Amino acid sequence: MIKIIRVGRERLREAYEIVNKVDQGMNVPEWFVAEPYEEFDFWMNEGRGLLYLAVDEDENVGAMFFVILPGLHPDNLGYDLNMEEEQLKLCAMMDTAAVLPEFRGHHLQYEMMQHAEADLREMGYKYLLCTVHPENIFSRSNVMKQGYEKLLTKEKYGGFLRDIWMKQIIE
């Protein structure tokens, strides 16, 4: 039985090890752009990052999911969508999902996103935004299944083509 838990900054290194392992094992490197540890740490330190882990019954960590609460920070994907300032403040970025190969097949990306969505709804966030490489059928299928809508395709993260997806969770 695998459970999803929300954790604090004290488990960030552990989560980042998963990001590194997944990054190194990517068959199509363009599909996954691993941010540096300092990027995750910045958001956690600011109190604007949410970190989720998937752990098995032996407490082995097999997946991580990171949410950024960007506010008016220039990294907010809402700027790409020409959102107004009040909308930007209600955006959460479903930023990074990484699942170790031995934990795949359990829909962990989906489950972690669902946990985050429930927390974000409770916190009053209205817009969930994420990016997916246009050819990454796995992530694309995952966000479509959760009700996200593709709004834009553009270069992000130093020249990588990405689709920007959005889901409105509060009317």
Model-inferred region functions:
Residues 155-171:
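C-terminal "cap" of GNAT-fold acetyltransferases
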Residues 96-99, 105-118, 141, 145:
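Conserved acetyl-CoA-binding loop-helix of GNAT-fold acetyltransferases
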Residues 1-18, 28-30:
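A short beta-loop-alpha structural element at the N-terminal edge
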Residues 104, 130-140, 158:
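Conserved beta-strand-loop-alpha-helix junction that forms the acyl-donor binding cleft
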Residues 120-132:
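Conserved GNAT acetyl-CoA-binding A-motif
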Residues 29-57:
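Active-site rim helix/loop that mediates acceptor-substrate recognition in acyltransferases
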Residues 63-96:
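Conserved acyl-donor/pantetheine-binding loop and adjacent beta-alpha core of acyl/acetyltransferases
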Residues 122, 134-153:
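Conserved active-site alpha-helix within GNAT-family acetyltransferase domains
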